[in-house]
């Protein structure tokens, strides 16, 4: 759309550059997301409980790959949800467990959406997560976490001590930690 307007200076769309998607998305975004996650869940820098934690990464595009790699480097037990069979195979070849969202959500201490698509973490995944699990979005679009649907289903959202963490409580009393109200943390 902007191509139809004359510009007085040259403009480059860096977000479309291969060097952006192949390097910044795959490495920089994964690293910056984990830096943000750690800053939020361990503000005192006493040691976040990532080693050994079961972590689900939804999506194995460039951002998902980076999130999975850095999560594994931090000691997390990473599983990947990927609908594209070729990307799912790539995740397996990279050494990650690949499973359905329902399987991963049932045992995940953290669930990360890395798809840039709405409704990536639906209400049934929130219901399946264990008590105190962390729910976060690597970046992307509004609505990746269906927390509005959760609120309509009787869940409640309250602020925690940290302004970057909200408590999402189910009607049965289970509480999840939602980072940045389900908006992108990158």
Where are these regions (language model features)?
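Phosphate-/polyanion-interacting regions in eukaryotic proteins
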Residues: 1-8
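Short glycine/serine/threonine-rich phosphate/pyrophosphate-binding segments
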Residues: 62-67, 88-89, 118-122
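Short, ordered loop/turn segments at secondary-structure junctions
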Residues: 16-17, 83-84, 117, 140-141
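NAD(P)-binding Rossmann-fold cofactor-contacting core
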Residues: 14, 58, 72-94
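Electropositive phosphate-/nucleotide-binding environments in soluble metabolic enzymes
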Residues: 23, 27, 31, 61, ...
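Glycine-rich adenosine-cofactor-binding loop
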Residues: 30, 34-37, 42-72, 79
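Adenosine-phosphate binding glycine-rich loop
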Residues: 10-45, 147-186
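Rossmann-like adenosine-cofactor binding region
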Residues: 92-178, 184
């Amino acid at each position: 759309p902007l191509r139809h307007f004359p510009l007085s200076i040259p403009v480059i769309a860096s977000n479309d550059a291969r060097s952006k998607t192949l390097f910044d998305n795959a490495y920089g975004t994964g690293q910056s997301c984990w830096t943000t996650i750690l800053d939020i869940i361990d503000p005192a820098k006493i040691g976040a409980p990532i080693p050994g934690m079961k972590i689900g990464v939804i999506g194995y595009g460039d951002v998902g790959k980076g999130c999975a790699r850095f999560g594994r480097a931090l000691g997390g037990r990473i599983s990947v949800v990927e609908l594209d069979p070729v990307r799912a195979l790539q995740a397996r070849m990279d050494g990650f467990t690949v499973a359905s969202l329902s399987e991963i959500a049932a045992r995940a201490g953290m669930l990360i959406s890395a798809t840039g698509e709405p409704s990536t973490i639906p209400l049934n995944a929130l219901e399946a997560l264990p008590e105190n699990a962390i729910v976060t979005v690597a970046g992307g679009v509004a609505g990746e976490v269906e927390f509005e649907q959760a609120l309509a289903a009787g869940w409640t959202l309250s602020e925690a001590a940290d302004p970057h963490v909200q408590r999402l409580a189910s009607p049965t009393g289970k509480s999840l930690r939602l980072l940045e109200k389900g908006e992108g943390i990158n």
